């Protein structure tokens, strides 16, 4: 198989970036010719080295993430695509929410499969933001992949198709050994948030919980960065520690091993939150909004609290306190939560699913 992958401007250690790098690495290691195009050069250096060691032809626009304009990205991508037409690509696998995938498809020949992968919820609110160019991408793709069953269903509704499918993220975690021990009875609990610090993720709810006397037995730990919440926003908040963003698997593992639970009070529909998948790799329970694809993760009932109305502070607090009580009473199971991850999201499992999908004819 000859596989051409395109992902829009990469961050150093983002979720979509990790998925695409791992797919490219897996394909190359399996003996398939693989090229990876991205419209920035902000990918972490260790990822560049891994890809090149595996034999991936990595092509990056020589500009930092967020600095190149639309014309510059389109022109660079067109030149790269025309050069890549010398190879007959069996699969052209594009990603993201933009119209530039159409340029990469110019590398297709008769018989090439054109796959497009959507990584967010694709709900009605999101659809209102789609450009005409991106709608053409969804309509013209030979195959559509959603990051959750919820997303796949919304893609079908939006396009009038009936063939979008779900495939899980290929991700890896530093947790290759059994998860850490559960907290002892009566111990102060450590609840955390992991991800981009934006207003739709429920950070204001966490700030209220940290100041709430009903939650005095809980410490709060924030791991992430984003424009809506500069570090000083968390200064002098009692029971709360801001750690900044992690930039690699070692920092990610250190963040998770120090937590007892994770929260995600999204007020919008999620595709399938990668932070919760990685939380489950560590065997940690979580509290999250019952929005988008998130309920698809809630298999181990005692380790998952779904909040139906994340805008309702009292409902969020009640869910946190229920999980805290179960943690103190020894009624959560890190082994059960980890088992769900191993069955559905472990790298070996998902790698095999993606390679089977990409190589089918």
Positions of PLM-derived features:
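N-terminal strand-loop element at the rim of the active site
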Residues: 6-13, 19-20, 26, 30-69, ...
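A short, active-site helix/loop in glycosyltransferases that binds the activated sugar's phosphate group
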Residues: 139-164, 171-173
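Nucleotide-activated donor-binding/catalytic signature segment of Leloir-type glycosyltransferases, i.e.
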Residues: 231-250
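Conserved acidic donor-binding segment of nucleotide-sugar-dependent glycosyltransferases
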Residues: 300-314, 322-328
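A charged, aromatic-enriched C-terminal amphipathic alpha-helix characteristic of glycosyltransferases
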Residues: 311, 328-359
